[in-house]
Each structure stands twice: as structure tokens, then as C-alpha cells.
A protein has these predicted regions:
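Core SAM-dependent methyltransferase catalytic element
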Residues: 219-245
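A short acidic, Gly/Pro-enriched loop at the edge of an enzyme's catalytic core
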Residues: 113-124
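Conserved alpha-helix/loop element of class I SAM-dependent methyltransferases that forms part
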Residues: 26-29, 35-56, 71
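Class I SAM-dependent methyltransferase SAM/SAH-binding core
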Residues: 57-114
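A short glycine-rich, Lys/Arg-flanked "PGG" loop and its adjoining helix->strand segment in the class I
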Residues: 138-153
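C-terminal alpha-helical "lid/dimerization" subdomain adjacent to the S-adenosyl-L-methionine
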Residues: 14-15, 157-212, 216, 222
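Hydrophobic beta-strand segment of the Class I
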Residues: 27, 125-126
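N-terminal auxiliary segments of SAM/dcSAM-dependent transferases
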Residues: 1-18
């Protein structure tokens, strides 16, 4: 299915790449405005759930401008950040250098469906607002499994679909009518933020994503809904002893 914001498969990946390149320089500003600053609270919640220990190896997928990667490093992790938008990565590198000139975070341009790291490399994987943008969600979750160490954790912050029909209608109305206005005013690109609702319409609800994770072998899968389900954090663990697959 296609429309002015949403296309499937590789066309979708190219479209998303263009959108993020066009807003990279003002991405942090518009995030603060469109979420009323709440995205910072949601990311801190994810980090608490991640239980990162000093010395652990962490991969922040779809890292964007680097908020989660920088926070993981502050918690003592050895961090890699992966994103397919070089424009977003440039902002992430600048932020990292400004916050900590000696930072050892490595930001890599690459595809979250074909992660350029060996099997069983990372103790912790995080992904903020990235699952919804994958051209093939199942392929992405499989590759996340591959690079996670046995006993490792996956945590994904993503837009959700509230169960309550009234709240869902209010939320979708905000995404449809107000968010593109913010995008046009503050970064000159309404389409980039109109895309959020269109991509969410094609993205599975929280429990469907959780079921996909379980089917692939992730254990202790749970969904933490935030603000009545407008946002969610998926938490999952790779078994300590890798079962036959």
C-alpha cells in the first residue's frame, strides 16, 4: 500500500532516508516541541529498564541524533550507534563531542535489518522510534537476535496504539492535524511529520509486536505502555542458553 507519505519495502526505506536527512538539523528541537519534552522522560524510563552495567557492550539501533547512545555511555557501557542516515549521524557525532570530547562512542552508518556486527556481540540493544521505520520488521528483529549475546536484552521505545478508542482518536487526531503543522513551522517540512501517523497505521499494535518477538525466540517479553498506550517500551531477553533454531 502506498500514499504520499508511506511506501513499502525498499522504496519505503529510501523515502524514510530522505525525510530524516531533510530534518536532521532540527530533529531534536521538533522532538521537544511535538512531545512537550516527554520523549526525554520516556527515554530515561527505557534506560532504567535496560539495567546497563559498566563495561557492557551496547548497540543503539536507529540511533538518530544519539540521545540513547549518549545516555548508555554515561552509564558506563561500551556503545555503538547505528543509523542509516548520515545526516543524523553527523548531528550525533557533534553532540557526543560537545558533551564529552573524550567519548569513545562509535557511530556507524548502516541498516538495522543487516546489522554490520558479528553474532552475539552485544549485551544490550536499544532502539528508539526505529521499529516502525523498518522495511521488514521481522527481518530486523531476527538480526537483533543474531547480534545479541545469550542473556542479553532488547529494549524498544516506539509509538503505540491505545486500546481506548476515544484516547486513540484524540491521539491520532493530534498526529494527523497538529504534528505536521509543527513540522512545517519549525523545520519547514510537514511531510516528515505527517509520515508518523501513516507509518503507525501500517505498524502492528503493541501485543502483535510482542508476539513476533516471542515467535523469534525472545523470552520475558513484556510491553510497558506509557500515557495510556500512545508510547510503549518493548522489553525482551535472549535466553542464556541458545535453543535450537
Amino acid at each position: 500500500m502506498t500514499n504520499k507519505f508511506y511506501t513499502s519495502g525498499e522504496q519505503r526505506a529510501a523515502k524514510v532516508g530522505e525525510l530524516f536527512a531533510s530534518i536532521a538539523s532540527r530533529y531534536d528541537l521538533i522532538n521537544d516541541i511535538q512531545s512537550f519534552g516527554l520523549h526525554r522522560i520516556w527515554k530515561r524510563r527505557l534506560l532504567r529498564l535496560a539495567r546497563v552495567q559498566p563495561g557492557e557492550r551496547a548497540l543503539d539501533l536507529c540511533c538518530g541524533t544519539g540521545d540513547l547512545a549518549l545516555a548508555l555511555a554515561k552509564n558506563g557501557a561500551d556503545v555503538k550507534g547505528l543509523d542509516f542516515s548520515e545526516a543524523m549521524l553527523r548531528v550525533a557525532r557533534e553532540k557526543s563531542k560537545a558533551q564529552n570530547p573524550t567519548s569513545k562512542i562509535e557511530f556507524v552508518c548502516g541498516d538495522a535489518q543487516r546489522i554490520p556486527f558479528p553474532d552475539a556481540t552485544f549485551d544490550v540493544l536499544t532502539i528508539g522510534y526505529g521499529l516502525r521505520n523498518l522495511a521488514d520488521l521481522d527481518a530486523g528483529l531476527k538480526d537483533m537476535w543474531r547480534v545479541t549475546k545469550p542473556g542479553g536484552r532488547l529494549l524498544a521505545l516506539e509509538f503505540g496504539k491505545p486500546d481506548n478508542a476515544v484516547w486513540r482518536g484524540i491521539y491520532f487526531g493530534y498526529l494527523k492535524f497538529l504534528l505536521p503543522i509543527f513540522g512545517r513551522i519549525f523545520c519547514g517540512n510537514a511531510a516528515a511529520y505527517g509520515y508518523i501517523l501513516e507509518s503507525l497505521k501500517h505498524y502492528p499494535a503493541q501485543q502483535e509486536v510482542a508476539a513476533m518477538m516471542r515467535k523469534l525466540g525472545w523470552q520475558n517479553v513484556r510491553v510497558v505502555n506509557l500515557m495510556g498506550g500512545i508510547m510503549s517500551i518493548h522489553c525482551a531477553e535472549k535466553p542464556s542458553m541458545n535453543p535450537a533454531r
